[in-house]
């Protein structure tokens, strides 16, 4: 049957009337053979037969270019080069994973999980050392692909992803959702990496350090033809957004991966479900033992709670799911010489000793520096300049000195002496009782702190001054145009033309961006101040709780600990920050310069009749979009969750409500339709 079909595709006469039909049949056949080869590992035609089909399709597309379809396999070869990558906002955030570095870490994770949901099984898979990618299919056709980026916004790499032969341009079958997001890892197999470096070596070009860097660099090529020549691969590891959300999906992570495979997406053959903790450890040890024999680089294994309902009950923290963890392999280690120690001053004034090492190749990169953290760490290691040290790449990323080799210590070895004065500004270095970190007391007077503080202040997640990059900030400070954050708002376009490579047009645009940044939010402003351990989420919680800067400025430690996710340590940092006169002077100067934000109205108890309740939205709402409905419910005090549980107070069911409605009815949860929701919102408007 297959031979007859193949012969027909290769021999059928083509006319303008039947060209579209023949070309679609060729595309469909080639796509199916790609899946059989890359996903099923069961090719049904020879390479030469595949090439003949491809050549026939290419010839027909040359004759009838207006009939080329989006899922044609010829579209993998790469098109015109791009000028830049567009930004894509993910439909839902692409979170990272927490790490476990030993059995104690994993055991603690396991206890947190089982304390919350009881006994669990884990879906275990190798942690590929590549680049996280989101791929969106609409009606089964690949529509767009993006990098993870910062988790919320990534780069559009659609044309490059289309060149990866193992990724289907059109999904197999017809049981997939109308819209489905597939998340996975793009990587470069070891053999492809070696071949790439062999070609570079032959041309006397720069070599790639490791497959991960090669994969990342290949995916971020503006010319997709370069990507097409790099032999990248892809494994799917999760479903993302699915629409409609009523579409039936498997109830376990492992079964959902099998669904992805049935649609033609490649998944790792090393995936395994482990019901017992001992099986998880055995799986980890087995993969670790075979690490060097695998066709691709890995840096650990990922353990995910297999049951989707349990995943939903566990939920997420700010940047990672509570139901998954990356169990990292022991880092690779090498010995080298400690040649000296430099002291660096960070944005918060932390004075950090940095070891200067005789360069050594470890964990795939050449390491010449490593942090020594603080004086306590130096004392713990008993380390001296001139020692032979053991260097490790912790988590295969951050170089770390883990020990010295005492028997190799020379007589000329010298003690490491912490400076009494800041190496940048000369201010006294202080170490507060109970803190391991020594800090420069110079505050924003210290140039090192000033640069980093203003870089942070202008960054995208802070005041988001478009065009105010690190190099611009450094020049502004070096040329003494800016000494504090408030000075940014005194800059004029003509002043900024003094900067290197800053013409009047660029300076005018930057001046406009600075003016626009005056209008912000209280949460962004608090984050921009660079208060120790106050990240985006904490800044947002502080803003929501106190509603005004004046209230926050006078808050006590006790009042601060009442804020969600603010513990005693963070509360002390916040209180200490607002107790410093110099910090208050900077804040007052910023407000005087015109920085402002809309007032946050603290809701009264009467205005929040749903306070303490948990609501869930499902199905299609016709008169109100879901984001608006969620925002209005939250304004009434409700917590809006993504899944139904026994703790759910009410489910709002729109059209085509599916499994969430069934579960709510099973649990006896109150169900409300859209009209009832609108009536509730109107009554509380």
From Swiss-Prot:
Active site (catalytic residues): 127 (n6-amp-lysine intermediate)
GO molecular function: DNA binding; DNA ligase (NAD+) activity; metal ion binding
Chain's gene name: ligA
Gene Ontology biological process terms in this record: DNA repair; DNA replication
Lineage top rank: taxon: Bacteria
Functional note: DNA ligase that catalyzes the formation of phosphodiester linkages between 5'-phosphoryl and 3'-hydroxyl groups in double-stranded DNA using NAD as a coenzyme and as the energy source for the reaction. It is essential for DNA replication and repair of damaged DNA.
Sequence ranges assigned to domain BRCT in this UniProt record: 605-685
Protein name: DNA ligase
Lineage, broadest ranks: Bacteria, Pseudomonadati, Pseudomonadota, Gammaproteobacteria, Alteromonadales
A Pfam family this chain is assigned to: HHH_2
Gene3D superfamilies associated with the record: 5' to 3' exonuclease, C-terminal subdomain, 6.20.10.30, BRCT domain, DNA ligase/mRNA capping enzyme, Helix hairpin bin, Nucleic acid-binding proteins
Enzyme Commission number(s): 6.5.1.2
Species whose genome carries this gene: Shewanella baltica (strain OS185)
Alphabetized UniProt keyword annotations: DNA damage, DNA repair, DNA replication, Ligase, Magnesium, Manganese, Metal-binding, NAD, Zinc
């Amino acid at each position: 049957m297959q031979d007859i079909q193949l012969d027909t595709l290769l021999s059928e006469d083509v006319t303008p009337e039947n060209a579209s039909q023949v070309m679609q049949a060729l595309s469909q056949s080639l796509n199916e053979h790609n899946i059989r080869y890359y996903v099923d590992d069961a090719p049904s035609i020879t390479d030469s037969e595949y090439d003949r089909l491809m050549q026939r399709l290419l010839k027909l597309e040359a004759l009838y270019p207006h009939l080329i379809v989006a899922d044609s396999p010829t579209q993998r070869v790469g098109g015109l080069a791009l000028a830049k990558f567009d930004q894509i906002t993910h439909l839902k955030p692409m979170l990272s994973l927490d790490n476990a570095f030993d059995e104690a870490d994993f055991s603690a994770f396991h206890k947190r999980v089982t304390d919350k949901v009881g006994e669990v099984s884990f879906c275990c898979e190798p942690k590929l050392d590549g680049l996280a990618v989101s791929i969106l299919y609409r009606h089964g056709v690949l529509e767009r692909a993006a990098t993870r980026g910062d988790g919320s916004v990534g780069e559009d790499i659609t044309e490059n992803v289309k060149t990866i032969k193992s990724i289907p341009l059109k999904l197999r079958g017809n049981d997939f959702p109308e819209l489905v997001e597939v998340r996975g890892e793009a990587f470069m197999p070891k053999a492809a990496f070696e071949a790439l470096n062999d070609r570079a070596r032959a041309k006397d070009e720069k070599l790639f350090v490791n497959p991960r860097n090669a994969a990342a660099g290949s995916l971020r090529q503006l010319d997709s033809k370069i990507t097409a020549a790099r032999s990248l691969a892809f494994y799917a590891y999760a479903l993302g957004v699915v629409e409609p959300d009523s579409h039936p999906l498997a109830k376990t992570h492992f079964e959902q991966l099998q669904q992805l495979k049935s649609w033609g997406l490649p998944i790792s053959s090393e995936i395994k479900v482990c019901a017992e903790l001992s099986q998880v450890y055995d799986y980890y040890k087995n993969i670790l033992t075979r690490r060097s024999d695998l066709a691709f680089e890995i840096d650990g294994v990922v353990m995910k709670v297999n049951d989707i309902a349990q995943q939903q009950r566990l939920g997420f923290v700010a940047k990672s799911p509570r139901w998954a963890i990356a169990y990292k392999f022991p880092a690779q280690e090498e010995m080298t010489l400690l040649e000296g120690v430099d002291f660096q001053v960070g944005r918060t004034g932390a004075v950090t000793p940095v070891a200067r090492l005789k360069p050594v190749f470890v964990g795939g990169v050449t390491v010449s520096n490593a942090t020594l953290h603080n004086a306590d760490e130096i004392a713990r290691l008993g380390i001296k300049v001139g020692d032979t040290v053991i260097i490790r790449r912790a988590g295969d990323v951050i170089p770390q000195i883990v020990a010295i080799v005492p028997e190799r210590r020379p007589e000329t070895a010298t003690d490491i002496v912490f400076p009494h004065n800041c190496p940048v500004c000369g201010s006294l270095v202080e170490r507060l009782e109970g803190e391991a970190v020594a800090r420069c007391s110079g505050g924003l007077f210290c140039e090192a702190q000033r640069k980093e503080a203003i870089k942070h202040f202008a960054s995208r997640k802070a005041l988001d001054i478009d065009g105010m990059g690190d190099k611009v900030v450094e020049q502004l400070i070096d040329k003494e145009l800016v000494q504090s954050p408030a000075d940014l708002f005194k800059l004029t376009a003509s002043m900024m033309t003094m900067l290197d490579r800053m013409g009047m047009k660029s300076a005018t645009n930057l001046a406009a961006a600075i003016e626009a940044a005056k209008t912000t939010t209280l949460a962004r402003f608090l984050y921009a101040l660079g208060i120790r351990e106050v990240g985006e989420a904490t800044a947002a919680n502080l803003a929501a709780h106190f509603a005004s800067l004046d209230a926050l400025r006078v808050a006590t430690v006790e009042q601060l600990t009442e804020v969600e996710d603010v513990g005693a340590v963070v509360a002390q940092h916040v209180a200490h920050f607002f107790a410093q006169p110099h910090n208050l002077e900077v804040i007052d100067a910023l407000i005087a310069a015109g920085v402002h934000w809309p007032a946050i109205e603290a809701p009264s108890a009467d205005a929040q009749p749903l306070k303490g309740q948990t609501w869930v939205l499902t199905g299609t709402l016709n008169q109100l979009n879901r984001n608006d409905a969620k925002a209005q419910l939250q304004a009434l005090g409700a917590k809006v969750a993504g899944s139904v549980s026994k703790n759910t107070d009410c489910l709002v069911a729109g059209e085509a409500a599916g499994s969430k409605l069934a579960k709510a009815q099973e649990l006896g949860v109150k169900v409300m339709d859209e009209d009832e929701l609108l009536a509730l919102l109107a009554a509380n408007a």
